[in-house]
C-alpha cells in the first residue's frame, strides 16, 4: 500500500530508503546529494561499485566502455546499511545525467530495479521513496513511475516523502 508523507525522507523510520542513482559515480544533486552528505558511507560504497564496473568495462570493451559500464549497471540495486535497522537502496535507474530537460531515467531500468528490490527486501518491511523519484533530476513522468512502484511493490508498505519547502 502506498502512503504519502509531508516531511524529510532522510528522517524516516522506514526500514529501507530507496532513491535513484546514475551509473557515473556522481551524487552531486537532489536526494542523492542529501544522502551523500548525511551518510558518507553510502557514497563511498556507491563510488567503489561504479569504479569497479567502469574498470571492468575498460578492460573488456575497447569501444565505448562508459556505455558498456552503464548498460551493465542499469536495473541493479545496491544496499548500504546506515543504521542498525535502516538500509539505503541505490537504484541504478539512469546511465548518465544532465541538466538540459532530457529524460535520463530509463523506465526499463527502474522497473528492473524494483524487481531486484522484491528479491532482496523481505515482505513486511517498509520502504520510503522521495516524491517524484527519477522525475525531477531524471526527467521521468511521475505517473509512470508511481504506477511502477504501486504495481511492483504492492506487497509492501511504501511511503512517498514530499519535502515541503
Model-derived features: where do they sit?
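Macrodomain-like recognition of ADP-ribose-binding/processing modules
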Residues: 1-165
